């Protein structure tokens, strides 16, 4: 509250002083979903046997040269858009594509690795936690992440030698299902961004649904967001 010598007072509530700066960026989620789907298509076809084992190095190159950089771009833009959960998820998958691609490129065709198996178990744990958090606002993402974690666990069991080739082939089936879901998700998110409303259902709820219900509803939580509050 400010006071002048003439005794007049006027209030300057914090919300009236809020300045909104619009960044010239678009959503990185459609790009992330489409590239994720193509990567899963490669992994699924490798596991089922539709891609010959002796072409493993080609698959690794595609994961590193195509999927990884696109996911990286999607991750950066998700952070710029202040979507912490989405950016964290994309970031974890970004480096996983580089890791898996590099492993395939550096290893003899068909070779398994206990180290890769343990990595997949750890990655699956993180993804399951993210899937649980996603149920609060984005159940479609939760289903996608749960399937991805299941695929990792099955592949991990094969890598450490605790399961046979059949389990690895089943993980390939999961990967193909993930590829289809990711393509649907990418199309839905792209249409949503173009129309500024939900066209294909993504079953948003809570704060995720409120993001399309008006500007005031989004400002209600602005003061507590990272980049506005004093500490992360």
Enumerate the language-model features and the residues they cover.
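N-terminal topogenic module of multi-pass integral membrane proteins
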Residues: 1-72, 206-232
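Alpha-helical transmembrane segments and their cytosolic membrane-interface
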Residues: 23-38, 80-118
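C-terminal transmembrane helix-loop-helix hairpin of multi-pass membrane proteins
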Residues: 24-29, 129, 136-232
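Helical transmembrane-bundle signal
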Residues: 36-43, 47, 67, 71-74, ...
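Helix-coil boundary and interhelical linker segments in multi-pass alpha-helical membrane proteins
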Residues: 48-54, 105-114, 160-169
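Structural signature of hydrophobic alpha-helical transmembrane segments
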Residues: 53-68, 110-123, 144-145, 173-176
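Membrane-helix interface "capping/anchor" motifs
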Residues: 77-87, 132-143
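Extended, positively charged loop/linker patches that create polyanion-binding surfaces
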Residues: 108-114, 128-137
